[in-house]
Amino acid sequence: MGKMCEDIKATPFFEEILNTTGKVIGPHTNVLFLKWYLDNIPGIKEKIEKGDVLFGTIDTWLVWKLTGGKVHATSFSNASSTGCMDVEKQEWYQKLFDYVGVPVSVFPSIQSESSDYGETTIFGGSIPIRGVIADQQSALFAEACIDAGTVKCTNGTGSVLNINVGSKFQTSPGGVDTIIAWNLDGKCTYAVEGLVPVTGSALQW
């Protein structure tokens, strides 16, 4: 995955990816995981062609399990965090999938944070799932950073700073990511995100 990232960085496509996804492509970019699986796990290509393989983030897996495999979906906030989404068009970035040779069909549908994600019956009765949101974006929302210019910093293993930048998508300089904070009633709110990987984890008791 590292070599592919370096190869992309040497081309004009690198800047296009940043301007489209809001994120710098790297080994953490989800579509590159699947590319590695395709190249290294025997039989996976055939299983994808048969429709026996699906891909997604942790929220996708949870919804899939909770609904008994009936719903394969993710939210805008989670999709934008993968680095595989055209965040302005609000859809998967087809050109990136084509470039690395990964079928977009294995990725989940993208829905609003307050959308219908099916129902679960694991507790006996039928319980509707009507909310899915990524972790840092949920913290931004929970801490009432609803208006453009409001900021939160979450400190734990690392530290994550998020700034609500309103309804207009724009990339940020200096390696700071631009992500979708949430999509409510068909309207996206964007945020910029800076990460310090080591904060609390610097202390080993």
Regions found by a protein language model. Give the residues of each.
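Gly/charged, well-structured mid-domain segments that form the phosphate/adenylate-handling core
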Residues: 109-116
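Conserved beta-strand -> loop -> alpha-helix junction used to position metal-binding or nucleic-acid-contacting
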Residues: 1-4
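Active-site core segments that coordinate phosphate-bearing ligands/cofactors
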Residues: 6-72, 83-94, 98-99, 120-205
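Flexible, glycine/charged-enriched surface loops at secondary-structure junctions
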Residues: 52, 105-107
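Nucleotide/phosphate-binding loop and acidic/charged catalytic motifs
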Residues: 73-79
